[in-house]
């Protein structure tokens, strides 16, 4: 199959691509480089310019690259709110991706309106309060709005399904008939050199540097 993976969060689609290629599929990633992580892709959606010109470019580039994003058997988007650019016509763009390709799936990953609405109800522990307090320093977030939820729901209903990457997202989408089986986060073990743990007098825990409120590090 010819597969398009649209968007990227922390190498998720890159690891998935490795596995799909090994299974014999043709895979293309169209995304930005996820900020400081500088993650690779096949079609780069990051702007070349900075400032105001860069903001305009970031909103036009997905449409400019559209001829390279059509004719796929399967399209999977990393999140219905990707790219997270104000005034980018996401709903129209995803309509084009659905229309010009065969199947269209959403990944249940990152933050979306379903996660914000149902996460507080279904999970005993959640990062929402800390995200508001420490990361954006506001009392509310736009994904809590009815407008965001209705948009999220429209994208869901017109898709072939949502694929959660862990139980938290499954619990938030489980009321929808579009919720498919959870497929855990992919990891390419062949790219990781195994080194035996050396146990000394203390335990060292690695916790990646990212978003203090949401993930607990800064």
Over which residues does each language-model region extend?
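Glycine-rich, highly charged phosphate/nucleotide-binding loops
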Residues: 48-66
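Conserved donor-binding/catalytic core segment of Leloir-type glycosyltransferases
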Residues: 181-215
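Active-site proximal beta-strand in glycosyltransferases
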Residues: 74-76, 95-135, 180-182
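Membrane-proximal helix-turn-helix segments that form the acceptor-binding/catalytic region
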Residues: 64, 92-99, 124, 128-161
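A short, active-site helix/loop in glycosyltransferases that binds the activated sugar's phosphate group
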Residues: 115-116, 140-182, 189
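Short N-terminal targeting/anchoring amphipathic segment
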Residues: 2-7, 65-89, 103-107
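A conserved mid-protein helix/loop that constitutes part of the nucleotide-sugar donor-binding site
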Residues: 11-15, 212-218
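N-terminal subdomain of nucleotide-sugar transferases
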Residues: 1-38, 42, 99
């Amino acid at each position: 199959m010819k597969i398009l993976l649209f968007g990227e969060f922390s190498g998720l689609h890159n690891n998935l691509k490795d596995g799909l290629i090994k299974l014999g599929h043709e895979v293309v990633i169209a995304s930005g480089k996820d900020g400081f992580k500088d993650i690779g892709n096949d079609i780069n959606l990051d702007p070349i310019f900075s400032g105001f010109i860069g903001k305009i470019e970031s909103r036009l580039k997905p449409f400019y690259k559209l001829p390279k994003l059509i004719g796929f058997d399967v399209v999977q988007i990393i999140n219905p709110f990707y790219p997270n650019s104000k005034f980018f016509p996401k709903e129209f763009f995803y309509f084009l991706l659905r229309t010009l390709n065969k199947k269209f799936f959403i990944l249940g990953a990152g933050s979306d309106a379903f996660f914000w609405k149902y996460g507080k109800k279904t999970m005993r522990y959640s990062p929402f309060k800390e995200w508001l307090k420490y990361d954006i320093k506001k009392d509310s977030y736009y994904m809590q709005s009815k407008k965001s939820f209705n948009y999220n729901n429209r994208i869901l209903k017109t898709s072939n399904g949502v694929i959660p990457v862990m139980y938290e997202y499954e619990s938030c989408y489980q009321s929808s008939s579009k919720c498919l089986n959870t497929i855990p986060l992919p990891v390419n073990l062949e790219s990781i050199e195994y080194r035996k743990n050396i146990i000394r007098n203390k335990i060292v825990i690695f916790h990646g540097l990212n978003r203090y409120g949401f993930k607990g590090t800064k």
